[in-house]
Regions:
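An alpha-beta-alpha
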Residues: 15-79, 98, 198
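Extracellular/periplasmic bilobed ligand-binding domains
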Residues: 57-154
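Flexible loop/hinge segments that line or gate small-molecule binding clefts
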Residues: 1-17
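Second-shell loop/turn segments in exported
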Residues: 14-20, 48-50, 146-152, 180-185, ...
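Extracellular/periplasmic periplasmic-binding protein-like sensory domains
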Residues: 112-192, 247-248, 252-254
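Segments of small-molecule ligand-sensing domains
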Residues: 172-189, 197-252
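Sec-exported extracytoplasmic/periplasmic mature domains
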Residues: 32-40, 62-70, 89-96, 113-120, ...
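Extracytoplasmic/secreted envelope proteins and their assembly/folding machinery
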Residues: 6, 27-31, 55-58, 62, ...
């Protein structure tokens, strides 16, 4: 697994391993950022009804936020919703200091655009799903504040980034698939690390036999672009760090 952060992914599944951090950790990081950096006392949480990722991460965030003394107002929107004006109005009327919306990218773009159109001045706080060129495009030139947690921040490995950008620019299809620019998203870097982690397991097994590769995976240790990668008994990565980035609305890049 590359960026599947919900704890249930590996629960009771002995054949699944992943290299990303999990949502209980991510929710705590986000809550601490809201409290310490954004000085929030009240947070409006918004996610898709029935979506395990949204609802799970909102729950972990709420638990951590309340331990820090923050108040959380939680609401959900139905699948395929496209109008978030009433939810944004509620957040404003509730006196929220921050909007936390760990949604999928399609909803995220609408939330950013509609928040800007409504003149919502409170920060929009989100998770790894918002770490996308789509969000940068939606926020560029607008008076919005967007913060996201993620697995990698550009500038972390100059050699890798140079090669990756050269690869993107070398082919028009690569460039188009990357949103028409050479910005490196964390999911791309994680995909790179996941590939080489799997390769380490194949090397350790000395064969492509599935059972042998599976037996080798728990002992794999790999130094990737995103850091040290190893697994616990559940098949989850031993991760204890995350990045928080903000969308630069002038340049259209992450700071």
């Amino acid at each position: 697994g590359v960026t599947c952060t919900n704890p249930q992914v590996t629960s009771d599944c002995s054949v699944y391993f992943r290299i990303c951090f999990l949502d209980p950790f991510q929710g705590t990081v986000l809550a601490n950022f809201a409290k310490d950096e954004l000085k929030a006392e009240k947070v409006y949480c918004l996610g898709q009804l029935g979506n395990d990722y949204d609802q799970g991460l909102m729950n972990y965030f709420k638990q951590a936020a309340e331990k820090l003394g923050m108040e959380c107002v939680v609401e959900s929107f139905p699948k395929n919703n496209s109008d978030f004006t009433s939810y944004l109005t509620t957040a404003k009327n509730e006196g929220a200091d921050v909007i936390f919306a760990p949604t999928s990218i399609s909803y995220a773009q609408l939330i950013v655009e509609q928040a800007a159109a409504q003149g919502i001045d409170m920060p929009l706080l989100a998770s790894d799903t918002w770490d996308s060129n789509v969000i940068l495009g939606a926020a560029k030139g607008k008076d919005v504040k967007v913060y996201v947690t993620t697995f990698y921040a550009e500038g972390g490995n100059a050699e890798f980034e140079k090669g990756f950008k050269e690869w993107i620019k070398s082919d028009s299809t690569n460039l188009s698939n990357n949103g028409g620019n050479d910005i490196i998203s964390a999911v791309s870097v994680m995909g790179y690390d996941a590939y080489y982690t799997a390769l380490e397991a194949l090397k350790a097994a000395g064969t492509t036999n599935p059972q042998d590769v599976m037996a080798a995976l728990p002992g794999v240790k790999y130094t990737g672009i995103t850091g040290e990668i190893s697994f616990n008994e559940e098949g989850d990565a031993n991760r204890d760090s995350a990045f928080v980035k903000t969308a630069n609305t002038e340049t259209g890049v992450w700071d």
